[in-house]
């Protein structure tokens, strides 16, 4: 049973990463539940791509899925986007037009030869208890599909739209941690063995050398037993940290929320 004194009800991948990166930003969003930090244009484009793929893998034909992603992008209000130096109406209009072009190019790269799957679930969400962990885990899986290496099992598929491909590939710690969150939730929801986490990265800008716009990384969970033990340790240690009285400090060097978290600290809004 969850300790009633803990400030949150569960851990998610985004929550844990925010806590490790910027404790004050984490406190604002996941404890106070204030969600007012604007998204970057790149982040909005990526979410539009996810919307398109969600509809495509739900059975809608390509053009219809692309249109629904574009509709999502156009419906995001200006105040939810961090336009940076584009402060005038004309500058923001120009930036939005560039976002639409970037989205249409990126989704065209993905759907030129879309990965084919026997899909069991799209945008699969859940919160589950895990033996040995002090808080439940929450995760959202882009796709849950029949595994091609074991037809009695499932694989988890994740899509990412990126400016550049990941350097550490499948062994990048942030991917491994995300995959374990998804593993536990999907295993509980589908009651089937979970074999792999498959990550498809799509580079949004056209490669000058003509190389492939898509890269595929595969995490076979059978090869990551040590990482599961490390994950459990990290969740327990992070939970211990938030269970004690503490001051939540900002991280001004955080490229995502450094300025905002420092402004909150300056104003003493969490005291």
Predicted feature residues:
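Short amphipathic alpha-helical segments and their helix-coil junctions
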Residues: 1-8, 23-36, 86, 156, ...
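An acidic intrinsically disordered interaction segment
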Residues: 3-21, 135-151
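Short, solvent-exposed segments of well-ordered alpha helices
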Residues: 10, 36, 40, 169-173
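Nuclease catalytic cores
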Residues: 17-62, 100
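A non-catalytic, helix-rich entry segment at domain boundaries
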Residues: 52-125
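Short, solvent-exposed loop/turn segments that connect beta-strands within catalytic domains
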Residues: 63, 130-134, 148-153, 190-193, ...
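Non-catalytic protein-protein interaction segments used by genome-maintenance enzymes to assemble
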Residues: 121-179, 184-186
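Metal-dependent nuclease catalytic regions and adjoining charged, substrate-binding loops involved
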Residues: 184-271
């Amino acid at each position: 049973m969850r300790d009633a004194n803990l400030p949150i009800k569960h851990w998610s991948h985004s929550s844990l990463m925010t806590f490790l990166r910027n404790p004050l930003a984490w406190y604002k969003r996941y404890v106070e539940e204030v969600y007012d930090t604007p998204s970057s244009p790149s982040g909005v484009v990526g979410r539009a791509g996810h919307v398109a793929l969600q509809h495509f893998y739900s059975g809608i034909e390509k053009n219809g899925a692309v249109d629904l992603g574009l509709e999502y992008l156009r419906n995001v209000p200006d105040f939810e986007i961090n336009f940076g130096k584009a402060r005038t109406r004309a500058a923001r209009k120009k930036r939005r037009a560039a976002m639409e072009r970037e989205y249409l190019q990126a989704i065209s790269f993905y759907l030129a030869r879309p990965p084919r799957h026997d899909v069991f679930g799209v945008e699969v969400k859940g919160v589950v208890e895990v033996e040995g962990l002090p808080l439940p885990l929450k995760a959202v899986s882009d796709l849950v599909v029949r595994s091609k290496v074991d037809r009695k099992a499932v694989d988890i598929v994740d899509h990412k739209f990126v400016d550049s491909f990941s350097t550490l590939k499948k062994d990048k710690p942030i991917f491994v941690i995300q995959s374990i969150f998804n593993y536990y939730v999907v295993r509980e929801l589908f009651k089937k063995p979970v074999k792999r986490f498959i990550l498809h990265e799509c580079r949004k800008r056209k490669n000058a050398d003509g190389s492939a716009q898509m890269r595929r990384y595969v995490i076979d969970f059978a090869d990551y037993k040590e990482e599961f033990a490390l994950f459990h340790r990290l969740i327990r240690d992070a939970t211990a940290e938030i269970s004690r009285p503490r001051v939540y400090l900002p991280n001004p060097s955080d490229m995502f929320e450094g300025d905002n978290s420092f402004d909150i600290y300056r104003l003493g809004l969490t005291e």
